[in-house]
Amino acid sequence: QPDPSLYGYVAYAAPFKSFICDSGVSGANIITSVSGDFGTLTNGQSGMMIDYNNGRVLFPTSFGTGKLVSGSYAFKEINVYKANDTQEKIVFTNKYYLNSRFNRPITGLPPPNAFVTPAIFVSTEQTENEQWALGGLYNTKVNVALTILAETSAQLENCLSLLADSKDAYFPQLNNNVWPLNALGGLKSGYNYNDIKTQYDDPSNLFTITDIQTSKVSDSTKIDESIFVGLADLTVEKIRTIR
């Protein structure tokens, strides 16, 4: 797969992205090695690296092109991205690569670093601090917007239902240094979100989803007839000391 942003590597891509790298996902086949006429290489061996974000394997340029590379992997049913645009631009103007999960013909490899649907785009819309108690305690409220681009109506319904059921759920605030991937999309080391979540589950470190509203975008305004669009607005709160 040609990628001018790569220096010192050649890329061999799978037809689906992104690869699952979380070993805490039950039943998921986490790819850690690939095979070919060169034998079998594990991640990191002879300079080989698995780019989980882009669903591909990177080799040093000395490896060459035109080889047959195979491996067994699980890929995400829905990709998740940090949104850099407004919901309006995501829904009405942006174009995406449809990476079908439902036995439609494969039309080509997903471009490197491109947004691939089905996907959910996450953005922080507003943050507000309200006085909570004497001694410098504040209730921090964060409004989070989700834009869901699904492949089928059923997939969209399932996403919206799961989100609606997440009211009153909580999740930990993580440090930046726990991000599992390096700049090339490879694992820094093993990754299990459930284990990391347990390490940060102190009650003072938890955000709670206190409100969630979901909706669908009408067919007449969809960016593509093959994409089903939904929106979700969440309010998450955390009691904390800010001074």
Task: Locate each region found by the language model.
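Extended beta-strand solenoid/passenger and fiber regions
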Residues: 1-47, 53-54, 62-66, 72-90
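Extended, solvent-exposed segments with strong compositional bias
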Residues: 39, 46-48, 198-204
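Residue-level recognition of well-ordered beta-strand positions that form the cores
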Residues: 72, 143-149, 233-237
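Intrinsically disordered, low-complexity acidic Ser/Thr-rich regulatory segments
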Residues: 77-116, 193-209
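Short, solvent-exposed beta-alpha or beta-beta edge segments that form flexible loop/patches at the rim
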Residues: 97-160, 213-225
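Short, charged interaction patches at domain edges and termini
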Residues: 113, 125-140, 188-243
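Intrinsically disordered, low-complexity segments enriched in Gly and acidic/Ser/Thr residues
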Residues: 154-208
